[in-house]
Amino acid sequence: MHRFATGLASKARLARNGANQIASRSNWRRNYAAKDVKFGVEARGLMLKGVEDLADAVKVTMGPKGRTVVIEQSFGAPKVTKDGVTVAKSIEFKDKVKNVGASLVKQVANATNDVAGDGTTCATILTKAIFTEGCKSVASGMNAMDLRRGISMAVDSVVTNLKSRARMISTSEEIAQVGTISANGEREIGELIAKAMEKVGKEGVITISDGKTMDNELEVVEGMKLDRGYISPYFITNQKNQKCELDDPLIIIYEKKISSINAVVKVLELALKKQRPLLIVSEDVESEALATLILNKLRAGIKVCAIKAPGFGENRKAGLQDLAVLTGGQVITEELGMNLEKVDLDMLGSCKKITISKDDTVILDGAGDKKAIEERCDQIRSGIEASTSDYDKEKLQERLAKLSGGVAVLKIGGASEAEVGEKKDRVTDALNATKAAVEEGIVPGGGVALLYASKELDKLPTANFDQKIGVQIIQNALKTPVHTIASNAGVEGAVVVGKLLEQDDPDLGYDAAKGEYVDMVKAGIIDPLKVIRTALVDAASVSSLMTTTEVVVVELPKDENEVPAMGGGMGGMDY
């Protein structure tokens, strides 16, 4: 009887606890973010304010006499830069709708930077010019879709005109001129990039790193460079420079760790039989196997060295396969039923010389079949085109460079960290612009190619008046790069634009650095076609979208003073 009563009491308590929890849940607040909705002219006006403020901050960097921008950082010293995309990325507004406009301009700058690597400032000021005129036209009753159609027709016409006037470049001097312009007139940077391209070719990888001196330097690594050094310093053959140097070596490439002494002995016998040095590339060499290699090197005088395979996962596999193709060997992998104890001479690669330091390995003049190497390069190029990941593209580009030529490193020097950082931004822009110029050719610089293309739009036929206004919006926008460059140099921009449009020489422009009118191509003031084409197309695309916007939905900021509702009583606490 007592047990029965205790059971009932227990069930009653459980029921009461359940009721308390249900009551508690009914008191919970659902804190969904409230939205603010802006319509029509108000929405576009606020977006335009964000676009204008961001563009005004970016445009001061344009041209040879553009100014720098100082950006506060959450950690470390403030960043000093003259790079448009860096300035754009750093700007965030408190007003949410204003921020939407700014974010869309950042999108333009990033898209232009991703495709062409330069021209972000040009893209930003073009976006502001097109969107400003578009907003005025829509507010005065124009049809937004017809305006958009007119803008699109005008851009297509300008791009066709620019392509017809582009000139391909090939000489080192022309490459240096493009680099100099993008580096804000610093001739040394332009020449450094031209030398790097001459050394590693147009497809070669050119990287930028911090230098250790006050001067800018170029270091070129020919052949394949692996970012792995010797496993043990006992492999060193040249005590003076602390490197292991192997001439005409055999190269064994193994995918896994080497732990078996028998496997090591088999490989050493092959090298001894041929009286040639040996390089072992594997995931790792474990202690007993490593000791065997070192003893044979020290006591038997066999020139041998072991390095770890660079990279991780699929990248490591692909890198080893590249090395095998370059040296004419095979990757020994258990997946194909191969092992080290059954290795024969045909599986080993070779090259003219290998130099191994504690940090890296350089393989010169691999013995691989030229046709096989070219096929491998084509395969990697296809992978680059198909890839959507920036990281994957970068890794594939590195692999291609290692196979096809070499790697050039631009070491940027300076008196302080801030100076080096600012110079690196300019060198990156210059390098990207140079690659774009080699790819699609050049046009007269200083904004004049766009300015003169605006003349051609007078003849463009349109279906109605609103489309004609869309064409005129682009015509006016194309004048802004020259206007901005002149204004930043302390000259009245409208006067410069007017004077250039009065005459008919398509190469005449305003040299803002010297303050005179010159033949831009002869003066070496040139722009890559790819850069200005991408800037215009991206700017027009996003501006058109913003012009046709009728509603903007943003989250309302949370009220920091709002106190959340208290939960109900906790179940199971009655005694």
Swiss-Prot record:
The keyword Iron does not apply. It comes from the Eukaryota. InterPro entries: Chaperonin_Cpn60_CS, Cpn60/GroEL, Cpn60/GroEL/TCP-1, GroEL-like_apical_dom_sf, GROEL-like_equatorial_sf, TCP-1-like_intermed_sf. Disulfide bonds: none annotated. Keywords: ATP-binding, Chaperone, Mitochondrion, Nucleotide-binding, Stress response, Transit peptide. Residues 1-32 form a transit peptide. Induction: By heat shock. GO terms for biological process: protein refolding. Pfam families: Cpn60_TCP1 (PF00118). It is found in: Mitochondrion. One of its GO terms (cellular component) is mitochondrion. The keyword ATP-binding applies. GO terms for molecular function: ATP binding; ATP-dependent protein folding chaperone. SUPFAM superfamilies: GroEL apical domain-like, GroEL equatorial domain-like, GroEL-intermediate domain like. Its main location: mitochondrion. Belongs to the chaperonin (HSP60) family. Implicated in mitochondrial protein import and macromolecular assembly. May facilitate the correct folding of imported proteins. May also prevent misfolding and promote the refolding and proper assembly of unfolded polypeptides generated under stress conditions in the mitochondrial matrix. This is Chaperonin CPN60-1, mitochondrial. It comes from Cucurbita maxima (Pumpkin). The gene is CPN60-1.
